[in-house]
């Protein structure tokens, strides 16, 4: 749900706390009075099969700018107060995010490490000058967040009224070019100029002989531990404002993570470094009032130590049906599932089930699925749903 930058990937969000304003429903803004029907009359004809991100983003942000302009003109004192109260309630992250986005926009989208050193290094006088000069632009970004959180809150309440709980996904690492890293450089392993001293990835495996070089900055877990991992506690609380359960992506990184030199071109030269482990989850459980509404994404290089960490905190792991068809001993097959587990047909890395069946599943896989389900597989997506139930 986070705001995306270059590449449009939710795994490279511009903030771990903010919402994506591109998800704001413009028709609802007409209902709320921040746009008019005439504003939407010039809606472009979008391709219904493929997303043209450039066209969609430019048009939608233009409409959000129009809504901000109208809000400033017509909002009542009560509405202005409601907006201000919401901003105050999110003061732990919103001012930094809004200023970060305003400066980035003012500088043509430059990453923060390319900004003048006084802005890059958050010189107080430079930040004050930028805040005053870009006040309207920063206000627009605060307004977009208010719209997102207001609409998402309605959606979440509607789902709750129907007995539906929402599951969200939290990447373990954040993007280097994010307000989080810019505002809290002390929490990450960075050089004096703000660039990473080492980056995240995973080692070589069957699927990639050079591993995966993700490039995210790594946490300085020793610094995070000094205040009981408060930044992470705030992050999970923010996630749980939006969803009911959080899937922790790359759970194994909390036990040990793959550290790669920042100048490496592949992940081959990395090494395993111990993560915060049980101390971290103990702190999170305390911060979340004794609860851990989390799912452990326990895929990849999973060791007994990772499994022990997951089980010690009673976190459900994942069972992915598309990965199940290598033989009868495969632990993803339904008869091996355990009560404390979440069944997925596939993950965000997989083709949707129908596409997988049509284009990726080989003859042996299809035969095994048919044998396992004792019949012809005419609708593989429904077959997978039944297996997961």
Which positions does each model-derived feature cover?
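Acidic/aromatic-lined carbohydrate-recognition and catalytic surfaces
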Residues: 1-185
């Amino acid at each position: 749900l986070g705001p995306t930058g270059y590449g449009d990937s939710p795994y490279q969000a511009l903030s771990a706390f903010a919402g994506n304003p591109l998800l704001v429903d413009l028709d609802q803004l007409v209902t709320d009075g921040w746009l008019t029907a005439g504003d939407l009359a010039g809606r472009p004809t979008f391709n219904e099969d493929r997303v043209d991100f450039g066209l969609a983003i430019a048009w939608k942000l233009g409409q959000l700018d129009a809504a901000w302009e109208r809000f400033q003109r017509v909002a009542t004192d009560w509405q202005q107060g409601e907006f201000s109260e919401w901003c105050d309630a999110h003061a732990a992250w919103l001012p930094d995010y809004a200023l970060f986005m305003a400066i980035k926009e003012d500088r043509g989208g430059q990453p923060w490490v390319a900004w003048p050193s006084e802005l890059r290094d958050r010189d107080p006088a430079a930040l004050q000058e930028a805040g005053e000069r870009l006040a309207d632009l920063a206000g627009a970004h605060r307004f977009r967040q208010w719209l997102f959180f207001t609409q998402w809150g309605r959606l979440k309440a509607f789902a709750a009224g129907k007995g539906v709980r929402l599951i969200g996904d939290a990447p373990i690492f954040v993007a280097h070019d994010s307000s989080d890293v810019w505002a809290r450089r002390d929490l990450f392993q960075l050089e004096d100029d703000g660039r990473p001293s080492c980056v995240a990835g995973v080692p070589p495996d069957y699927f990639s002989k050079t591993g995966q070089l993700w490039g995210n900055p790594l946490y300085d877990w020793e610094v995070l531990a000094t205040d009981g991992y408060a930044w992470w506690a705030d992050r999970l609380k923010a996630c749980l404002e939006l969803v009911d359960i959080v899937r922790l992506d790359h759970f194994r990184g909390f036990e040990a993570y793959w550290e790669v030199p920042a100048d490496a071109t592949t992940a081959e030269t990395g090494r395993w470094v111990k993560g915060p482990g049980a101390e971290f989850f103990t702190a999170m459980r305390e911060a979340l009032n004794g609860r851990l509404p989390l799912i452990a994404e326990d895929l990849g290089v999973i060791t007994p130590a990772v499994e022990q960490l997951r089980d010690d905190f009673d976190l459900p792991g994942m069972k992915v049906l598309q990965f199940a068809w290598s033989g009868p001993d495969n632990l993803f097959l339904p008869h091996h599932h355990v009560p404390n587990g979440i069944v997925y047909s596939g993950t965000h890395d997989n083709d949707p089930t129908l596409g997988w069946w049509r284009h990726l599943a080989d003859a042996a896989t299809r035969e095994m699925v048919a044998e396992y389900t004792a019949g012809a597989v005419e609708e593989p997506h429904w077959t997978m749903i039944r297996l997961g139930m």
